[in-house]
Amino acid sequence: GPDMDVPAGDIGVGGREVGYMFGMYKKLTREFTGTFTGKGLEFGGSLIRPEATGFGGLYFVNQMLQAKGIDIKGKTVAISGFGNVAWGAATKATELGAKVITISGPDGYIYDPDGISGEKIDYMLELRSSGNDIVAPYVEQYPNATFVEGKRPWEVKADIALPCATQNELNGEDAQNLIKNDVLCVGEISNMGCTPEAIDLFIEHKTMYAPGKAVNAGGVATSGLEMSQNAMHLSWSAAEVDEKLHAIMHGIHAQCVKYGTEPDGYI
């Protein structure tokens, strides 16, 4: 019910589709409750909800690095996908001082040694909204970048790897490539982005690995914040929502450290 379930969008379901469902829900129940989340702002949606999963993922990854005394500034980041999650992750990574060097789609991946920031991140949204589901046109817009057809970005040397596309997108072979290239941290921002084989390899090699249930909680956390705003008939600013999201992700990381630290110090 409206106080228990948190329906929200995912691949192929955005604010428009949630809006359709919320409209029918209102018609059937004659109630305006915060049942559906990821709604448009005019229906009681929350600011930064579309990018919240990516934002929260970077807050968690940054906490992981800080716990090991590593500064995220200047680190290179390999991101897969080019939808809302990848867009949010690229935006926040850039804001924190990291350099995003890849995005990907079903057709292959983009490697941009100059970094994907500013207008390039905005162009990701243009690619997504085109409906073609391809990233190849990126190199026409930014010729210094390289498009690698039919492959995933995990063969690129990067300090941080962030699967942001779909399930099972990072397998054992990909994990071996990342480990060979001395990746510092892997954050599973997509749901079940890493195969069990890949996860086992990261743990075996003591690579910092953030499981999806922790690192991608920012999306559903912000859905909860959207429900809170609806219940109180309030609309918080983007900065307020972002601050609360940061606090939630900080708390989740603290719990992971508390209960996930092994005798040798590996978390």
Where do the protein language model's features map onto the residues?
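N-terminal ligand-binding/catalytic initiation module
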Residues: 1-47
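A short glycine/serine-rich beta->alpha loop
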Residues: 4-6, 42-49, 208-211, 262-266
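Glycine-rich beta-alpha junction loops
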Residues: 11-17, 105-110, 215-218
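Active-site nucleophile and cofactor-binding loops and adjacent substrate-binding regions
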Residues: 10-11, 46-53, 78-82, 189-191, ...
